[in-house]
């Protein structure tokens, strides 16, 4: 059933119909379309288009249709309807006859689809917020179990300073907290109802759009009908949120892929999230993490595609805007799947503490401590930095750690160095001294875990 046709004297070419139809993907908006239609039927009563009895008959039929859709959403795809709006209207007419043809009075598919999509987006934001918080909780639990698991921290993929596995986990908690905040901000701008704006100039019926917005669970109604039917900022924002969130997940995946290598050997992933090789029987591949890392491209691509779709569109609605859904659906599905998978990766991960400790003790990661020691003795930092660089060269020549150099060797580079330097160079001292907020000391880690647990409770 097409919702238009009187203007045309020839049927649409079947090839055009296949090109034009959107039911194959916008069927996912069926529930929202039905819910919006129920609210619209109530609004039509207030302007005397429908009687209360007619509205009740329509609502009863729409509620029955909603139950059918929830039981078997795939049934929709068997139809040759143009889009989800025509499918719902056709089914409604099947149930109530000519009365179903009155429902679209004063409404356009332009404000209808905008409403459907916003309702769907609101539901998705709620689900993504839950998934984001669940992953944060998994990270916090992993951090709590590994507060004293010392490992090297890296810059330029070179060992830099000692940190703990807990500190690494908490770094991603912070990233995910920002993702959560972005979603909450997006929801504020998303939470306005388009319904009642018509095709572009508003509805000709004196409907209370604020009341209508409340029936649909929106905070308020939009202020300008022309902007409303043209607006897809919420799609761009959600795609941007997803893109940033996926970048964070990709970095998480890349770190663990490296930690899991034989060369690093810091962690071992559970069999539940790894796979083998068809040829090499010894292989245990981090496929879950590699797929998370690999799926960033499709999400970033959806954001770019939507930006390009919108950039040259005149007001108001254009058919180009039909391209808003497939990329959005896929991107948000992908982000949610990857959040759940990232949490699963942490379930059963083994941190190899002895190997982490060994790696942290290598690479002269305590060099900054020696520089700070010299500064405390009155040596200007830039000079201390140079002295420590020379000392590291000497240690490399001897093939020993800094703390293994004899005092006489250390004093070749600065006479202020004394026996009291050796406790300063211990790994534990390196950690304990980082006790300012956000640092890697056990006290700061414990406090950060407590604060994160309270926030996520």
Swiss-Prot record:
Pfam assignment, any one: ASL_C2
The pathway is: Amino-acid biosynthesis; L-arginine biosynthesis; L-arginine from L-ornithine and carbamoyl phosphate: step 3/3
Enzyme kind, highest EC tier: lyase
Q: What is its EC number?
A: 4.3.2.1
User: GO biological process: what's one of them?
Assistant: L-arginine biosynthetic process
GO cellular-component term (any)? cytosol
**What reaction does this enzyme carry out catalytically?**
2-(N(omega)-L-arginino)succinate = fumarate + L-arginine
Predominant cellular place of this UniProt entry's protein: cytoplasm
Keywords (A to Z) from UniProt: Amino-acid biosynthesis, Arginine biosynthesis, Cytoplasm, Lyase
Matching PANTHER family: ARGININOSUCCINATE LYASE
The family classification in the record reads:
Belongs to the lyase 1 family. Argininosuccinate lyase subfamily.
Know the name of this protein? Answer: Argininosuccinate lyase
């Amino acid at each position: 059933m097409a919702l238009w046709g009187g203007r045309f004297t020839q049927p649409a070419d079947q090839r055009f119909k296949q090109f034009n139809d959107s039911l194959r993907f916008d069927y996912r908006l069926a529930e929202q379309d039905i819910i919006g239609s129920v609210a619209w039927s109530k609004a039509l009563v207030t302007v005397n288009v429908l009687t209360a009895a007619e509205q009740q008959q329509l609502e009863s039929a729409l509620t029955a249709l909603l139950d059918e859709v929830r039981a078997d959403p795939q049934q929709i795809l068997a139809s040759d309807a143009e889009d989800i709006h025509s499918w719902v209207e056709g089914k409604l007419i099947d149930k109530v006859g000519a009365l179903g043809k009155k429902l679209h009075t004063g409404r356009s598919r332009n404000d209808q689809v905008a409403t459907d999509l916003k309702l769907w987006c609101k539901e998705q934001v709620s689900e993504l917020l839950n998934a984001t918080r669940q992953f944060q909780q998994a990270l916090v639990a992993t951090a709590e179990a590994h507060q004293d698991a010392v490992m090297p921290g890296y810059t330029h993929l070179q060992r830099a300073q000692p940190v703990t596995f807990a500190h690494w986990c908490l770094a991603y908690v912070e990233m995910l907290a920002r993702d959560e905040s972005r979603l909450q901000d997006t929801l504020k701008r998303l939470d306005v109802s388009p319904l009642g704006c018509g095709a572009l100039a508003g509805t000709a019926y004196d409907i209370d759009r604020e009341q209508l917005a409340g029936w649909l669970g929106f905070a308020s109604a939009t202020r300008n009908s022309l902007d409303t039917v043209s607006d897809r900022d919420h799609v761009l924002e959600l795609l941007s949120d997803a893109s940033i969130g996926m970048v964070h997940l990709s970095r998480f995946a890349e770190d663990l892929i490296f930690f899991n290598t034989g060369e690093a050997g810091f962690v071992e992933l559970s069999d539940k999230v790894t796979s083998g090789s068809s040829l090499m029987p010894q292989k245990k591949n981090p496929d879950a993490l590699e797929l998370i890392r690999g799926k960033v491209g499709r999400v970033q691509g959806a954001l770019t595609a939507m930006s390009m779709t919108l950039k040259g569109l005149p007001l108001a609605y254009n058919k180009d805007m039909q391209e808003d859904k497939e990329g959005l659906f896929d991107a948000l599905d992908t982000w949610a799947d990857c959040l759940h998978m990232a949490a699963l990766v942490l379930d059963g991960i083994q941190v190899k503490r002895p190997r982490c400790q060994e790696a942290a003790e290598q690479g002269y990661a305590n060099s900054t401590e020696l520089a700070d020691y010299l500064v405390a003795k009155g040596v200007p930092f830039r000079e201390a930095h140079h002295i420590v660089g020379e000392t590291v060269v000497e240690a490399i020549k001897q093939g020993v750690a800094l703390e293994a150099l004899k005092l006489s060797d250390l004093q070749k580079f600065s006479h202020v160095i004394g026996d009291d330097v050796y406790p300063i160079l211990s790994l534990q001292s390196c950690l304990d001294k980082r006790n300012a907020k956000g640092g890697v000391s056990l006290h700061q880690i414990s406090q950060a875990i407590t604060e994160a647990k309270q926030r996520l409770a």
